[in-house]
């Protein structure tokens, strides 16, 4: 079973988080993003967004890819498909914070550049990302892209795209998750709410940070009927079952619980 969920426990801890394997020590420090694959390997982006590491399940460094190799510019997300190919959300930044272009870059299982599978030009002066999520498939990647009033979900494996109508998506949405089996879209808004898309035009509110003091939900991922979000305010993981019986029954996990249970590792 292909693991399709990003390791959001790393994302929320960001620059302060470190991990050491007790048998073959390897330390991650200043991490900005990480994800796992079906073999138990971890892909890590450092806080400069210019270096990516692949670490084996037993803590060995398998390879390192750097922006200086001309494979990418500034990596903000990373996932691996079922074939072992690696996909990066790559961003070109100009004048400090302004985004000139975004893309999806494909690397081989050895970390070598293969191609750019998607490219999105940014509006002049924009500081917000248009690509707001990635989900690996068996032979490719699904990525979510904001448009004015919709989220475009594109599947590189199938060469297909589908638009989900979401009012003011460009200004409201921070990030997305997608479940291919149920064709379900989830998203986090800048004001700290998590929604599930519905065809009715009234999307279902799954979580509202206004009801939890200090909560700031960020990156989300979906796996086996459960939605996870890194809470950078409370420094834990929001866990939201999304099956028919338990939708809305939110609970929370510590980073240690998440690692132990392998739910989002």
Regions inferred by a protein language model and the residue ranges of each:
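Flexible "stalk/tail and boundary" regions
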Residues: 5-265
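N-terminal Sec-pathway targeting helices
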Residues: 1-3
